[in-house]
């Protein structure tokens, strides 16, 4: 993309496509067995493939499938739900799907496939945190030298729940994780925390000395894990871990100036031939992930002040890839307002492609030896210079003061990034700028292509905002209207492909239940 931009600086009308590849040449002494090992080391099927050098083609591998209604969906019996989830590759389970069937029976129609994919994304563990919101029906603490301390902590949690009047709420990991902040807020000890409808990053008010004057600023920080994408495509997974983390405070109007990277890997000295089936070698994951992270950070110009990789056999099952960032913005330059009917939503930044499709649901499912072959589109491709342009745009006070609400494009793409901005929305998918032709409605709705943002502005400010985007060489297009319908509707060339009630989307599917067990703690030194 950067090379194409350079050519267009010389000739703005140029229609060019620049690609790169790696050519390996072997002599006839190389055995088939050695070639197989080399293929496994060099070629990750998630992102690349062997090229027939006699053919030069830019045609896509994937066939474009038209999106239609799922005939007979609302007539499904309970016994058909579980097999249907597997056949369709859904992250939701049979209980969730049962709720979807009930909903469309009440609507008197079968869903479009796009609607089912959107619900699967919204209700995935990645988006609704199913694991953390699962109701715990019982908690057992096994015998160990810290059993008494753990039970005391559990008793303290239950006491605070009663004190806060939250006994009617589900007892779950999410409640345990957030109870401390709720308690401190009730006691008046979190007066410096910013509270708004936007949940892009943790945000606190601070006083900043600027040339001898005290100014009120917002300090924002966020961390992001990209364990799943980095496991299957290390370079792209790690680079977009940083890019995605940056966009969260950025959508909160902050300029990100500092980062931290903490990762976990297995034995990087293990022989390539001993790699588990369906896995990439640990040395490949570790090296390519480091290259991907540093590539993105260097191009966007971000200082990572702490880097640490931990090595443990437990990370063979799943890579740990954590990126954390800190940003800040002058408080008076930030506007937080509830979108109103008639407001417009502008999509700006990178174009939309098939990269990242299914990322939210993919990271919410179990994986097997075939994952590397079937998860090709789930990993996003980063373009740091494009995100740097977004950073420049959002540093301008005259720009941020036009924005009523903002969201970055992460898990779920258009359906979530725009879908979360207001209760009632009409979204026009055919207006979305694409990297190439042929994307259907589902792909346009759930693609997780990187470096994209959505902002809500008043109708009278659209032209002004567009002009500022043009000054920063950023593509921007008006893609949605805020309505008073309390429904999310999507259209593609005047054809309605999504019509879901906000209440049903926000229901997050069926309730989940589990028993929790705190296992025996053997090591007396937790470090």
Question: For the regions a protein language model found, what residue spans apply to each?
Answer:
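Core nucleic-acid recognition elements
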Residues: 1-367, 373-386, 393-401, 410, ...
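Short active-site oxyanion
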Residues: 452-453
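Aromatic/hydrophobic pocket-lining residues that form π-stacking "cages" and hydrophobic walls in ligand
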Residues: 293, 418, 465
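Anionic-ligand anchoring segments at beta-strand to alpha-helix junctions in alpha/beta enzyme folds, i.e.
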Residues: 417-442
